[in-house]
Design a protein with these regions (language model features):
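Bacterial N-terminal signal peptides that target proteins for export
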Residues: 3-29
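Sec/Tat signal peptide C-region and signal peptidase I cleavage site
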Residues: 29-38
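Extreme N-terminal tail/first-helix region
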Residues: 37-49
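A short, Trp-centered hydrophobic/proline-enriched beta-strand micro-motif
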Residues: 48-67
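A generic structural motif
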Residues: 61-63, 85-87, 104-106, 151-153, ...
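An acidic-aromatic
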Residues: 73-125, 190
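Gly/Pro-enriched, hydrophobic low-complexity segments
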Residues: 132-134, 139-219
Length: 219
């Protein structure tokens, strides 16, 4: 647990903090550098599935570049709201309110905030993000799996996200967001794998509120 806390203490800027929160794909997919000629229907299927998520709650396991894992619960509500509630003992909370992502570190009483669109998660959360425009399909070797890499060439500083969808009749659009890989501008990779998906559940907007740990004079 001390190693987990040390990892968060070393976060020196929002991009690094964000890279801790978002990503995952299978090793076979990550190891394939070739970009396939994307079939519009496949990209459309994945985007339709993504946009079809109204609310989602799922367990996650996050793995950083050193192989250390942290678990927690993800809650998502469109448009643009997300919450990463980390396991007990991790003094960090990440919340998106539809416009910005906020990282709250309760141990050091610090808050960092940046626009959703300026991060790899923009592809997931920003309702104005044209995912299909910036998406490339990566080969998976499995017709039941779609891998989309999203990167804005005009803004490489926003990073790259690779989303993995698997065929699941119970998911919106018949494709389930299984995992994703987020790569920041410093090429730091984090992986996030989801499980126990619950779609269409009632999610109160209060879920995306948070308690400010900073002294009143510093807010």
């Amino acid at each position: 647990m001390n190693q987990i806390k040390n990892t968060f203490r070393k976060l020196g800027r929002p991009a690094a903090a964000l890279s801790l929160a978002f990503a995952a794909a299978t090793p076979a997919i990550l190891a394939t550098p070739t970009v396939a000629q994307a079939q519009p229907s496949e990209i459309d299927r994945a985007v339709t599935a993504l946009r079809g998520i109204t609310t989602l709650r799922a367990n996650f396991v996050q793995t950083d570049r050193s192989g250390q894992t942290i678990s927690g619960v993800l809650t998502m509500k469109r448009p643009g709201k997300i919450r990463f509630q980390y396991q007990k003992g991790v003094p960090l909370l990440i919340v998106g309110d539809g416009k910005a992502l906020t990282m709250i570190d309760y141990e050091v009483r610090q808050v960092q905030r940046w626009p959703i669109g300026n991060s790899p998660l923009g592809a997931l959360l920003d309702p104005n993000k044209d995912v299909a425009r910036f998406a490339k399909q990566l080969p998976t070797g499995d017709p039941g799996v779609i891998s989309l890499q999203v990167r804005d060439p005009k803004h490489p500083e926003y990073g790259t996200i690779t989303m993995i969808f698997v065929r699941n009749a119970g998911a919106p659009g018949g494709m389930q967001l299984d995992s994703w890989v987020a790569l920041d501008a410093q090429n730091k990779r984090t992986t996030m794998r989801l499980s126990g998906h619950q779609y269409g559940i009632a999610v109160d907007d209060k879920t995306f509120k948070w308690t400010d740990p900073r002294p009143a004079t510093r807010r």
